[in-house]
Amino acid sequence: MAILVGIIKQHVRNYMPEVFGLVTDLWDNVALQLPLVTLVEALGTALDAEFRPFLPTILPPLLKVFDGPQIEKNEKRTQTQMKVFDAFLTFGANIEEYLHLVIPVIVKTYEWPEGATALRKKAIQTIDGLSRRVNFSDHASRIIHPLVRVLESSNNEVRMAVLDTLCSLVIQLGSDFAIFVPTINKVHGVAR
């Protein structure tokens, strides 16, 4: 169905209530969550700004993918979570008014030290990508302090993703980023 949406693009708008009804009906089937997230991502791409009214319907199930015990390292669940991060990037500026719901999920994922490296890196890269589409000025502290903690304790691959994301946040926040520099310098000095 995601391929079909990719072909017909914005012409799917007339069928959105039915499509979202189908998505919500099938969501509890864990085996279908990855294809459903792919479908939602395709809808977000096809409709762009017209997708915004549907976000309140689809965000709760997407965020629910991150609920439950974090200890559970299930490959299928990790793939679905990574696809949800891709969907967040696809939603772009449409997601801005829901950042108060989305950011805690992303932060919790990249802060989790036992999490899969690929998933943690994807969460950090999601913040990086969103920083080019949405205004994080009201959420800077909630994002940057956990990033600094991750910078302090992670493997090199995750640390490099954190540094890239911090650079993107410097560009977006400009002089407002200055308040975080002493904290970063303190951690950077310890990491050397």
Where are these regions (language model features)?
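Karyopherin-beta/Importin-beta family HEAT-repeat alpha-solenoid scaffold
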Residues: M1-R192
